[in-house]
Design a protein with these regions (language model features):
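Conserved structural position within tetratricopeptide repeats
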Residues: 61, 92, 111, 143-146, ...
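Helix-start (N-cap) detector for alpha-helical repeat units in TPR-like alpha-solenoids
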Residues: 65, 118, 152-153, 186-187, ...
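Amphipathic alpha-helical scaffolding segments comprising HEAT/armadillo-like alpha-solenoid repeats
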Residues: 11-25, 46-61, 80-92, 114-123, ...
Length: 238
């Protein structure tokens, strides 16, 4: 270990240089082990020992590609409500691997951000919506929104209920409530666009789809919808 003395100060290169490199290596090393082993609990434990969610959030925006990928993955396991917006920004990262990891973590935290009781109720509503049982999902979704009004995903699921029941005005209102609480919720932008299309608001639908793609460039279905709308417009104008 090299010691440097200057004006009575005793500083070591280990303290000024090596320590930050060790912290960096711990995260990337844990990430590489995870890619080989797929042992998520071990990865989470290794990262949690040395990194706070705030530090991971910083690395998500400032680290190199591997560091950003590792941070995005970690935040899905160790993050909290304050991690949702940074992950939402990372959905537009130049690296596709970062975008994919951020998307998985973003969706996980949207579902997990509420209290455990509300989380379980949301999972029930999601299960009903996924099965197309929108009428059965409506009442528990409305109760959940009333009990946990800050829970963005609850508003999203309520919007899906209304949309499935072809009540597009109520669905529009619920999608807006979701986006008011989480502006990076790109599935809500896409759902809102579908409502506006059904209500004949083509320009607004296009704007919502473009916002969806600005947030998450990998939503190919939104890109296809934009092309279809523009193609129909050209055919109508002709």
């Amino acid at each position: 270990m090299l010691a440097i003395e200057n004006r009575g100060l005793h500083i070591t290169t280990e303290e000024t240089v090596t320590s930050p490199l060790v912290r960096t290596t711990r995260l990337t090393s844990a990430y590489r082990r995870f890619l080989t082993s797929a042992d998520a609990p071990r990865f989470a434990a290794e990262v949690d020992e040395f990194y706070s969610p705030a530090t991971l959030t910083t690395l998500l925006s400032r680290g190199d590609i591997e560091m950003r990928r590792a941070s995005a993955l970690s935040l899905g396991m160790l993050g909290n409500r304050s991690s949702i917006e940074p992950l939402g920004r990372a959905l537009g990262d130049p690296d596709r691997g970062v975008r994919l990891a951020s998307d998985d973590s973003f969706r996980a935290l949207l579902v997990r951000e509420a209290a455990p009781l509300h989380h379980q109720k949301l999972l029930k509503v999601m299960h009903l919506n996924d099965g197309g049982e929108h009428a059965a999902a409506l009442a528990p979704a409305m109760i959940l929104v009333d009990q946990a009004p800050k829970y963005a995903e609850a508003h999203h699921q309520l919007a899906i209920c209304w949309q499935g029941l072809e009540n597009y005005y109520q669905a529009e209102s619920a999608y807006r409530s979701c986006l008011w609480r989480c502006r990076f919720h790109y599935p809500a932008w896409q759902g809102l666009a579908r409502c506006w299309l059904m209500l004949g608001e083509t320009d607004r639908a296009l704007s919502a789809l473009e916002l969806c793609l600005q947030i998450c460039p990998d939503v190919e279905s939104a890109r296809l919808q934009i092309r279809a709308i523009r193609r129909r417009r050209r055919q109508t104008d002709a």
